[in-house]
């Protein structure tokens, strides 16, 4: 896992340079997103003060969003628009990565999978904008 300050989100693909962006166009798991609050909960579940986010193998870390409540909703980060599609369940690798109980500590806190709807540059510090139901589709209609 490589940590970067900015990335290009490519519609229907993934993040430029990420292994998933090379696969089939329109893949169901283009990027993964986890919240800082989830990372803190995982650390607490393991009795730790801190866990390095890159250990969890998610593409983006955000804060202030209730990710699990945003199924099929749209968000904008930087210039890119994403649709959150499904919960991102932790894999069995988490027991070896985080230690015994790592997988169990992540249950319910794995974050979300998302599709990239509009390409754009994203970078650390970008505001995450929630696009309420209807607003993204309305914006598309205006642009056409």
What positions do the PLM features span?
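Electropositive, beta-rich accessory/interaction domains or terminal extensions
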Residues: 1-77, 81, 86-87, 136-144
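Serine/threonine-rich low-complexity intrinsically disordered regions
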Residues: 52, 102, 108, 132-135
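Glycine-rich active-site loops that engage anionic ligands at enzyme catalytic sites
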Residues: 62-118
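Well-ordered alpha/beta subsegment
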Residues: 112-144
């Amino acid at each position: 896992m490589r940590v970067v300050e900015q990335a290009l989100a490519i519609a229907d693909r993934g993040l430029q340079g990420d292994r998933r962006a090379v696969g089939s166009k329109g893949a169901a798991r283009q990027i993964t997103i986890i919240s800082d609050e989830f990372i803190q909960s995982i650390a607490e579940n393991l009795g730790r003060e801190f866990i390095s986010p890159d250990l969890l193998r998610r593409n983006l870390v955000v804060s202030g969003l209730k990710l699990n409540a945003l199924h099929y909703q749209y968000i904008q980060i930087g210039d890119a628009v994403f649709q959150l599609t499904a919960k991102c369940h932790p894999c069995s690798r988490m027991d070896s990565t985080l230690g015994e109980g790592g997988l169990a500590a992540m249950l319910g806190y794995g974050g979300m999978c998302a599709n990239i709807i509009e390409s754009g540059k994203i970078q650390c510090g970008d505001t995450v904008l929630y696009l309420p139901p209807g607003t993204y589709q309305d914006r598309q209609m205006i642009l056409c």
